[in-house]
Structures are given as structure tokens and as C-alpha cells.
Amino acid sequence: MTETAELTAATDADVLAVAREQVLEQGVGLTQEQVLRVLQLPDDRLEELLALAHEVRMRWCGPEVEVEGIISLKTGGCPEDCHFCSQSGLFASPVRSAWLDIPSLVEAAKQTAKSGATEFCIVAAVRGPDERLLAQVAAGIEAIRNEVDIQIACSLGMLTQEQVDRLSAMGVHRYNHNLETAKSHFPNVVTTHSWEERWDTLKMVREAGMEVCCGGILGMGETLEQRAEFAANLAELEPDEVPLNFLNPRPGTPFGDLEVLPASDALRAVAAFRLALPRTMLRFAGGREITLGDLGAKQGILGGINAVIVGNYLTTLGRPAEADLELLDDLQMPIKALNSSL
């Protein structure tokens, strides 16, 4: 059978039957076209889809769930115009620029570790780090290492090669830089820098030996076709971790009046991304509380998710850490231990 004939046969077949053979049995992620067909499935097949995504997660990732906490080292005043973000200095947002001191950073790391988390991510609202920020990050990492047994990640915007090398030398375990959305939709979301600039940073991070964390936000006006495109973009990048956020419209931002993504669409997307990325850590991130609520959080963890951010996010409230940990315990999902992630 030719490649074209095989594609036609796959298109004609039921996409979940194809996924069961291709993804569950062979570990090969769905293509962009196949992901689109998953995203187009009706609500009456959602339960079946989530069950398959859970099987894939258990088969290729195992039962453990990685827990992470995040903290904003530098909040607000960002010069970029990411339309979803209340930290941009270009919008009429209530968020104001502020820096966190090192003792507060260390205390946040301690509290994160107490929750059972193995990863602590230091975040800054910047286009990219300047010398002041890099010095503060270096001091913070050293202070945390002296008191807390936890892996450290950073999210500091776009990097130069020299900055990548410096962060690697500091012992940064994982670097987060989200592509945010499909390449074709990105100009509708950000105009002050390009999708390619973000991609270039991610490639340098990987080449330096740090783990790559890259995901985005769903519900920013993208089409289903673009949602499938985004999954394919991520599959090409092959990140170690994909955080999935759902738009929580922020007052004063260009996306402040967008509607929240329906829960069924969000869950379909979670499962579709799992089927596209069978071996990748897929993390519940911002916006899940407003989009999915408590029941949706459970469905997501039983529908492909195998990592969570506990506690609050950068400018919005998250679920209490205790609620997530209790849910994982109820579902008999063990929290990934620090020694198993080294």
C-alpha cells in the first residue's frame, strides 16, 4: 500500500481505533490531521477519548505525577505585548512592577518542597534577562540550594547563547519558554517579537543540556485547525514537558473580553495533546480552575495529564496545594519523588 493509500485508509477509519493501534500499542504520536479529527469528536465520545488518553499516559509515562511550584521573581512592567498577559506594561492592567527579595524566594521554595514538589520554577516578566536579573537569579539559586532539596527551573524570556550557557552553569535543570500557540496564530497573540525568536531560544536550551519546557495557552481565539497545528509544532520540538494553560481573561488586556473555553473543549484538547505526545510530561497549568473546576481537574488527570502546578500562579489564584494532593491520593497517583527525577 502506498503512503497516500495508507493515509486515506487512516482517514476513513475511526480515529480512536487508529490511535489505539498507533499511539497506545506503537507509541507513535498522532499527526496534525489526526489530532484535528480528535478535536472534532462529539461530546458523546469524550469519555471514550479520555479513557484512551489515560491508557496512553499509563503505558508510556507510568502512574507518577510530577508536582511543581512557581514563583514570580520580577512581576509586571514587561515591554512585550502578549495579548493574554496582565504583566505587560503596555496595557491598562492593575498589575504593577515589583521584585521579590531573596529570603522570600527561599521561603517559597521551602513551601513548594513541603508540598511534595520536585521542581521550583523562577519566573520573570521580561523580554529577556538583563544583568540585574541574572545576578538575582544566580543569588536566588545559590540561596535555595543551601536550604532546600529541590530542582530549579527558570522562565526568563528569550535568551542569547551566552545567557543560555550561564543558566546552564548555574545548574538550572529545566527552562520554560512557551510557544503559546500555533505558528500561524502567533501574530494575532504577540506583535513585539516573533514565534521564531522563541523557537531559537528553545533550541539553544536543548543544545546546552537543559530540559525543555514548552507549551501554551488554549482558548485564545485559535481555530481547531490551529490547535492541531500547535500540537504538531510541539511534537516537532519534542520538549521534555508541555504545560497546558487555558485562557483566564485578564481585565485590561486585549483578550480580556474573550469567553472562557468550554470544559468539554478543554478536556478534548488535553486528550488530543496526549495522543500527539505519548511520552511527554503533560502538565496542568494556569486557567484550569476557571475552565474545568474540581470535576474537570479529576477528568484531566484521568485523561492524559501527568504533572501539575500546585498553589497559585503568577497573577491569578490556583487551587490550594492540599486539594490537588488529596485528589492525587484519591486517584492513587503517586507523586514523583526527587530521586526518581534525577
Swiss-Prot record:
GO BP, sorted A to Z: biotin biosynthetic process
Transmembrane portions of the chain: none
Pfam families: BATS, Radical_SAM
GO molecular function: 2 iron, 2 sulfur cluster binding; 4 iron, 4 sulfur cluster binding; biotin synthase activity; iron ion binding
SUPFAM superfamilies, per database record: Radical SAM enzymes
Coiled-coil parts of chain: none
Residue numbers binding [4Fe-4S] cluster: 78, 82, 85
Pathway annotation: Cofactor biosynthesis; biotin biosynthesis; biotin from 7,8-diaminononanoate: step 2/2
Cofactor note: Binds 1 [4Fe-4S] cluster. The cluster is coordinated with 3 cysteines and an exchangeable S-adenosyl-L-methionine.
Reaction catalyzed: (4R,5S)-dethiobiotin + (sulfur carrier)-SH + 2 reduced [2Fe-2S]-[ferredoxin] + 2 S-adenosyl-L-methionine = (sulfur carrier)-H + biotin + 2 5'-deoxyadenosine + 2 L-methionine + 2 oxidized [2Fe-2S]-[ferredoxin]
Annotated keywords: 2Fe-2S, 4Fe-4S, Biotin biosynthesis, Iron, Iron-sulfur, Metal-binding, S-adenosyl-L-methionine, Transferase
Enzyme Commission number(s): 2.8.1.6
Domain Radical SAM core as annotated: residue spans: 63-288
Binding of [2Fe-2S] cluster, residues: 121, 154, 213, 283
Cofactor: [4Fe-4S] cluster; [2Fe-2S] cluster
UniProt keyword annotation of Isomerase present: no
PANTHER family assigned: BIOTIN SYNTHASE, BIOTIN SYNTHASE, MITOCHONDRIAL
Family that this chain belongs to: Belongs to the radical SAM superfamily. Biotin synthase family.
Subunit text: Homodimer.
Role this protein plays: Catalyzes the conversion of dethiobiotin (DTB) to biotin by the insertion of a sulfur atom into dethiobiotin via a radical-based mechanism.
Name of protein: Biotin synthase
Organism: Mycobacteroides abscessus (strain ATCC 19977 / DSM 44196 / CCUG 20993 / CIP 104536 / JCM 13569 / NCTC 13031 / TMC 1543 / L948)
Lineage: Bacteria, Bacillati, Actinomycetota, Actinomycetes, Mycobacteriales
Gene behind this protein: bioB
